Structure formats: structure tokens, C-alpha cells
Amino acid sequence: MGLGLGVRAAPFTYAAHALAVAAAAMVLVWAIYFRGGLAIEATNKNLIFNVHPVLMLIGYIIIGGEAIMVYRVLPTSNHETNKLIHLVLHGIALVLGAVGIYFAFKNHNESGIANLYSLHSWIGIGTITLYGIQWIVGFVTFFFPGAAPNVKKGVLPWHILFGLFVYILALANAELGFLEKLTFLESSGLDKYGTEAFLVNFTALVVVLFGASVVVAAIAPVRLEEPQGYVPIPEN
């Protein structure tokens, strides 16, 4: 899957780590400072909703991105160890994403708001479903019980391609989520040029840059002299 990009993966993994920290800090500032905090149960239902963007960004997008980059961040480590870390991080991202979606439903149900009426919600449900399927297929094929070597070799390119597709879809839906929430807030009187509006927009931009860094890191070689036919993620 080497694409001859002429760049190494390392600079993009470093950029992704830095952008991940920035995005996590920004969404926490938004949820806690501007939106009043986080709560599992509260009379102010907005505090329940605030759990949703925090878990979806930090759990689903960031941890999911780190899972994708495991083979690039630790290229000289034991492959079985990398595979386990890759699997576990994706599992954590999947669980946190599902919990984040649960809190969106919880907020809607307790606030009398309809569910699944927006494009953001439709894509969100579709994406988490595809993410779950990808994780299960990866677990069965590459981890336990594990497929035959020739099957792994045939599945691997599709596993990589489908995984990146689902991740890019999740990134696009995160952008829809930022846009939808900010539009609701502005229609309720939030200053369109105020600090909070700028924070949300800049957070969304940082997420785009983070996602782009993850994708490039995933397809770029560890070393520029990789031979033709190089596959970024090992086959076994």
C-alpha cells in the first residue's frame, strides 16, 4: 500500500500527537468552561449532552487515530505486541464512542428532543456500526482464532482500506456535529463572533488537521527507501 509519497511517517505521527493534545484540551475547555461541565445525571440536561462531544472526540476520534498509528509509532517493536495494542485501542475507541452516543440519546430522551432526525445522527449510527464490524472482523482474522496466512494476506489490504474509510467518515461526521451544535447555539443567541464560537470552529479545524496527519502517517513509509510493494502494516 506504499504510495510513494516521498515523505516519512514520523513527522506526521508527531504532528498528530500534538494536535490530539490540543483538540482534547479545546473540547474540554468548551464543555467545562463554556457549557457548564459534564454530568451523568443532572436537572440541567445540557450537562448530560456535554459528555457526548468529549467522549466522541477524545475516545472515538483521538484514541481511534492513535490505534491506526500504532504500527507507525512503534515500527521496531514486536509485531504481536503492536497488534494487541492496535486491537485494544480500537476496542476502547469503539466502547467510548458507543457510550458517547448513548449520552446523546439520554439527553434527547430526557429533554423531549426527537432522536435520529439529522444527517449527523444517521451517519453517526452507521459509522459506529461499521467500526464495530471492522473490529470484529479484524479480531477474528488477525487475532483469535486467526485466519490462515494466505487469507490474512488477502484480507489485509481491504482491512486497511476499509478502516481508513470508516475513520475518515467518523472525522467528517465529527465536523457535522460541531457545525450542528454551533448552529443550534447561535440560533439560540450565541454571539457568532464570540469566543465560544471561535473555539468551536478552531477545535473543528484542529480535528481536521489531526485526522489528515493520522491518514498520511498510516500510508507513508517508515523509511523513504522502502522497496516497491511495501505494506505499511505488517501482514502477519
From Swiss-Prot:
The keyword DNA-binding does not apply. PROSITE patterns: CYTOCHROME_B561. Two-heme-containing cytochrome. Catalyzes ascorbate-dependent trans-membrane electron transfer by utilizing a concerted H(+)/e(-) transfer mechanism. InterPro entries: CYB561/CYBRD1-like, Cyt_b561/ferric_Rdtase_TM. L-ascorbate binds at A67, I68, M69, V70, Y71, R72, V73, L74, P75. This is Ascorbate-specific transmembrane electron transporter 2. Its EC number is 1.-.-.-. The keyword Transmembrane applies. Its cofactor is heme b. One of its GO terms (molecular function) is metal ion binding. It is an enzyme of class 1 (oxidoreductase). Residues 1-13, 72-84, 144-153, 223-236 are cytoplasmic. Binds 2 heme b groups non-covalently. The chain crosses the membrane at residues 14-34, 51-71, 85-105, 123-143, 154-174, 202-222. It comes from the Eukaryota. It is found in: Membrane. The lineage of its organism: Eukaryota, Viridiplantae, Streptophyta, Embryophyta, Tracheophyta. It comes from Zea mays (Maize). Keywords: Electron transport, Heme, Iron, Membrane, Metal-binding, Oxidoreductase, Transmembrane, Transmembrane helix, Transport. Heme b 1 binds at H52, H120. Heme b 2 binds at H86, H159. Residues 35-50, 106-122, 175-201 are extracellular. One of its GO terms (cellular component) is membrane. Residues 15-219 form the Cytochrome b561 domain. It is a multi-pass membrane protein. Monodehydro-L-ascorbate radical binds at L116, Y117, S118, L119, H120, S121, W122, I123, G124, I125.
